[in-house]
Amino acid sequence: DVSFTVEDGEMLVITGPNGGGKSTLAKLLMGINEATGGKIILDGQDITSYTIDKRAQAGMGFAFQQPPRFKGMTVKRLLSLAAGRELDDTTCCELLSSVGLCAKEYINREADATLSGGEMKRIEIATVLAKDHKICVFDEPEAGIDLWSFSMLIKRFEQIHKEKKQSLILISHQERIIRMADRIMVIGDGKVEAVGTADEIVPILFGKKPESCGCRIQKGGELYER
């Protein structure tokens, strides 16, 4: 059982060992999996039974761990659909550039299997950024992204957090993402093991021995078990 609240404008990072329940939680939040109990409340509204589309309409944005592909749809069209309005080339280029893509090469390409997993991941993140959602959920946004693009993505998250005051939930093993958080929630065995600030939680994650904590942290390009 997991129970937590995300405040307006808060950045919450969820981390923990593989198989601990992070992605399952993300799928529940996104509406991919159906909850067997409890409720999901957004601005006082019970959205537990909402479909993915209806949750998006209610103000929730998602970036999945495995981005869907859209044969026959251009990247520009995909961004416009995500924004809920027709976007011009300049706006599309700005969105794509903010996630580390050379924009002019992508806006008229199809968002399909001709793009790599890392490219699709960044395009999907750009679709979330195309609209001012009440809350955005990013499931392992660093997956498949090169270090240069990841640095740009970090700056983008920091900018959103500072300027737009959107609530952000990031599920990640990446230390740089973990350290950005207002709060960190550690999940293991389907339960909340710890909640606190980066100053409180990061030393615990790095300080415990592997046998006493299952936490898996990514530092730079390498993975560390803690």
Language-model features, listed with the residues they occupy:
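The feature captures the beta-strand-to-loop junction immediately N-terminal to the Walker
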Residues: 15-17
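ABC ATPase NBD coupling module
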Residues: 46-61, 205
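ABC ATPase C-loop
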Residues: 128-129
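Walker B catalytic motif
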Residues: 140-141, 148
